[in-house]
Amino acid sequence: MLPITQLEHLPKISGIYKVLDANGNVIYVGQAKNIYSRWNNGHHKLSEIIAEYGIEVYIDWAEIPEWLLNRAENATTSFYQPKLNSKTPPVV
């Protein structure tokens, strides 16, 4: 797990990531074929996350093969029901 201020240290792997607030609540879930690139090339939720939660936010991840990303993201999002995900997808 890394603070959102240390995006340059994210791994260059495919996987699911969770964004957690200062209290450890999952506020956003996503997937990427390259987690490092997703966040360091301007993630579409970054400004919203910082505006609402400040910089005391953390990113945690799990390495997942590319072929399993959609299913893993759907299951993770359904489990946590994070505030910043626009909709909670069904588990498939």
Enumerate the predicted regions with their spans.
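Coupling/hinge elements of helicase-like and P-loop NTPase modules
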Residues: 82-92
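Basic, amphipathic alpha-helical patches used to engage nucleic acids or provide basic targeting signals
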Residues: 39-47
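GIY-YIG nuclease catalytic motif and its immediate N-terminal context
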Residues: 1-33, 37, 64-75
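Basic nucleic-acid-binding interfaces
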Residues: 50-66, 70
